[in-house]
Design a protein with these regions (language model features):
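Phosphate/diphosphate ligand-binding glycine-rich loop within oxidoreductases
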Residues: 3-110
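Conserved small/polar residues in nucleotide/adenosyl-binding loops
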Residues: 112-119
Length: 119
């Protein structure tokens, strides 16, 4: 993996994150598709979410996934939130916009697309 000044950065915030396989998955997908992107984990303590999100935006991080225990706490750090994520009260995906991050919940999508026990 060749990381340059033009390499886009994405990552996962949470605690713990050391066990996550997300970097391996996303970095392999980036390599296979020829994307100049790197995905890494960021251990963020409870109470530090807002400063982590501000820092990520300042560092031009393209997007973040959010895992436990920060899926609710991160909402206060967003400039916009998808209506479904707002209704659920939990966000697991942050997408960079011109003014900050917009939050989404993609976990709920799995409930609607997963096969039922009878399928």
């Amino acid at each position: 993996m060749d990381i340059k000044g033009t390499t886009r950065v994405c990552g996962l915030i949470g605690n713990p994150v050391g066990h996550s396989v997300s970097p391996a998955i996303h970095n392999n997908l980036a390599r296979l598709t020829g994307k100049d992107m790197v995905y890494t984990t960021f251990k963020v303590e409870k109470g530090d979410v807002a400063s982590a999100v501000r820092g990520a935006y300042s560092l031009n991080i393209l997007g973040l996934n959010v895992t436990v225990p920060h899926k609710s706490e991160v909402i206060d750090s967003l400039v916009d939130i998808d209506p479904l994520a707002k209704a659920i009260g939990a966000v697991n995906t942050l997408v960079r916009t011109d003014k900050g991050y917009k939050g989404y919940n993609t976990d709920i999508c799995l409930l609607y697309t997963s096969p039922s026990p009878r399928d």
